[in-house]
Amino acid sequence: MPGDASAICTLFEGDYHIALAAFINSLHTHGYRGSVWVGYRGPLPPWARGVVAHDGVSGFEAAAGLTVNFVLVETKRDLTNFKPDFLIDARRRFFPDAKSVFYFDTDIVLKCAWPFFEEWTSYGVALCEDINSPMPSTHPLRARWRRFYTPSGFSVARDLDVFLNGGFVGVTGADWEFVETWKRLLDLAEAAMDTLPEIRDRRHLFDKQDQDTLNLAAMFCTRPVSIAGKDGMDIVPGGFLMSHALGDSKTWRKNFLGEALRGYPPTSADRQFFQHTRGPLRAFSPATDRWKRLNLSAACAVARFYSRH
């Protein structure tokens, strides 16, 4: 059965359960059958019906062959900085024999048939370019990172000119060293945060700890990598893999029409998201879903005539 060789992980809290439903629906649409392991804080999603608790996991079948397992996480970290920890702990406890393990941010939806993702990991650690790419190998931030980590025994295994998005990684058991390296780098970064200058912009050594250290893992770890471009997350047109709702203005919170009237049209990620809100899991109530779709349609109509871009 497709998906049996893989395990998928994600993390959520708060209203990200809306995005989580759409993400899981997109997995189902594109053929994934297997388990989704969800680390969470706070209450379970309202759409998680018939959940059965066993051995520290609360699970239910979202659709035939697709199981969602909720794992309560206890950490003081921001969940975005808990990604490698969750991957390592979940693999050890729940799926030690999985051929491929994937992490996706919940605000991603798939556009591509699932078997391609499994094939992708056979070429190396699967990664995607970020909106802030490129970042040349000679960039001063990379030089500062090298200086910071050299005393801890890290050295550059490959020069990178791209900057990677921290919302997705796919890795086989053979390349698991990459995830362990990511965790060590993130732990060292977090331990140093109190000693670093309080700078609230990209000059900070670790502006986004999870993402910066993922990039460092790609620099320092000797395992092969396979990197998709910005199109891999719909950051630029032409992609076929995923769509990622980047930034602070999240799709499920937007007033699309209001934004369109200010000159900001719906994004590709906005439109892709609403292809996956109705099933097998209901991201919204039926009334809310209808209203948001009308709002999105009106915004798309306005955007044909008015945009800042």
Indicate where each model-derived feature is located.
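Secondary-structure boundary elements
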Residues: 29-33, 92-100, 105, 172-179, ...
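GT-A fold catalytic core of metal-dependent nucleotide-sugar glycosyltransferases
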Residues: 84-136
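Conserved glycosyltransferase catalytic-site signature
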Residues: 20, 80, 84, 166, ...
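Short, solvent-exposed loop/turn segments at secondary-structure junctions
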Residues: 15, 43-44, 108-110, 132-134, ...
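A structural signal for short, well-ordered beta-strand segments and their strand-loop junctions
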Residues: 37-39, 100-105, 110, 127, ...
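N-terminal anchoring/stem segment of glycosyltransferases
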Residues: 1-78, 92-97, 285-309
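Conserved catalytic core of nucleotide-sugar-dependent glycosyltransferases
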Residues: 114-184
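A glycosyltransferase accessory/donor-loop signature
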Residues: 1-4, 156-159, 177-309
